[in-house]
Design a protein with these regions (language model features):
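Short, contiguous, pocket-lining structural segments
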Residues: 31, 133-137, 153, 157-160, ...
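His/Met- and acidic-residue-enriched segments that coordinate or traffic transition-metal cofactors
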Residues: 11-13, 20-30, 70, 171, ...
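CBM-like carbohydrate-recognition segments
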Residues: 2-37, 49, 54, 65, ...
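Extended ligand-binding groove/face enriched in aromatic
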Residues: 56-60, 68-185, 192
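Inter-helical turn/loop segments and adjacent helix faces that build the functional surface
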Residues: 50, 148-159, 211-223, 273-280
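Oxyanion-binding "anion nests"
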Residues: 205-251
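Alpha-helical scaffold segments in carbohydrate-active enzymes
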Residues: 9, 13, 42-45, 65, ...
């Protein structure tokens, strides 16, 4: 299979999508929000391996256009594109990007609302989410904060990102199952619907291994993050649907629908773990790949993606989330394909 051609098809479908630029425009690249941030991160990772200058020019044009128009209000989700901007800065060394990175990182450090114990409250474009920790936060915000600290030589930012990973592990990782709850609330001290939601888990499967790889090998936080990630991966392999290779949107409830974006992100993490010598599950990882590839239409549109999902107070909430093509569905599938190009293709 030509994974590069497939990746191009998925990416081109995303670039062709037109939207209205609202914060809830989840398919097109017209918006500066978390779905587009996921897609930009994937595109930068492809550039790192391909050195495709046309792709780099498209990424630069996207960021330059949004900066010229003015960046949106700051929250956890609008932070997601900043990770790609930081990688772009590290790649191009264009100093014009540094002030935007520094200003946003300082807002995270000093302006973002905090929960008890100093956690990053999952503030979004439409909800305060008082005293709430979500696993999404680690991918959307903490990856950026750590890389910004690396790029601009700000060790305090790096240490804060490490602390946030440890705090989220403390409250969201289930030691009994190895899986992650979607969220935790200090008001009432509960896990909401106690859902082991697939995409929430997949942010960890994809994001934690990238984060751990960036840390020094002798860093104890790297060891903790890696071991927690390995425990999650072992649990995920037990939940995989044997017929399709995909995962259900509620990981431990086979009556819930199979979900593509989570499966793509999980496959990315498993493939990367195999490449790094941390896992030996290539057959199951490739079964997931085949399942995801089977959801890609002739025009590159990725099907079977659950729409943006806020916190649910019961499991039926997650079962009822509609299926809809999204930028993060395209982006996470594209991210998975980067590992196929690097590791097995």
């Amino acid at each position: 299979m030509d994974y590069r051609e497939l990746a191009d098809r998925v990416l081109n479908r995303l670039k062709q999508s037109k939207g209205d630029g609202r914060w809830d425009d989840h398919l097109s690249l017209a918006t500066w929000e978390w779905p587009q941030g996921v897609a930009m991160y994937a595109m930068l990772k492809v550039y790192e391996s391909s050195h495709d200058e046309k792709l780099l020019a498209e990424i630069k044009a996207w960021y330059d256009g949004h900066i010229a128009r003015g960046l949106p209000g700051r929250n956890i989700n609008t932070t997601a594109p900043m990770l790609g901007l930081t990688l772009l800065y590290e790649t191009t060394k264009e100093e014009k990007y540094a002030p935007f990175i520094a200003d946003w990182a300082e807002w995270i450090m000093h302006g973002l609302p905090r929960t008890e114990e100093g956690g990053f409250q999952h503030l979004t474009s439409d909800c305060i989410n008082e005293q709430q920790l979500w696993d999404d936060t680690l991918f959307m915000t903490c990856l950026f904060l750590y890389r910004a600290g690396c790029a601009l030589k700000k060790p305090a930012w790096q240490e804060e990102a490490k602390y946030q990973f440890l705090l989220h592990i403390k409250y969201l990782h289930c030691g009994k199952t190895g899986l992650w709850y979607h969220g935790w609330c200090f008001l009432g001290r509960h896990h909401f619907g106690e859902a082991f939601w697939a995409r929430g888990n997949s942010w960890i499967t994809a994001g934690a291994i990238d984060f751990a790889e960036w840390l020094p090998e002798n860093d104890p936080v790297r060891r903790i993050v890696t071991e927690t990630w390995l425990e999650q991966c072992r649990a995920l392999l037990q939940c995989q649907d044997p017929e399709t290779g995909l995962w259900h949107t509620l990981l431990d409830h086979p009556d819930s629908y199979l979900e593509t974006s989570a499966s793509a992100a999980i496959a990315y993490g498993l493939l990367k773990g195999c490449r790094m010598g941390l896992l030996s599950c290539r057959d199951q990882a490739m079964a997931a790949v085949r399942g995801v590839v089977g959801m890609i239409g002739p025009d590159g549109l990725v099907d079977g993606v659950s729409y943006g999902t806020p916190m649910g107070m019961d499991l039926d909430f997650y079962r009822r989330v509609p299926i809809q093509p999204t930028a993060y569905g395209q982006g996470l599938t594209f991210l998975m394909l980067t590992q196929l190009m690097d590791a097995f293709g």
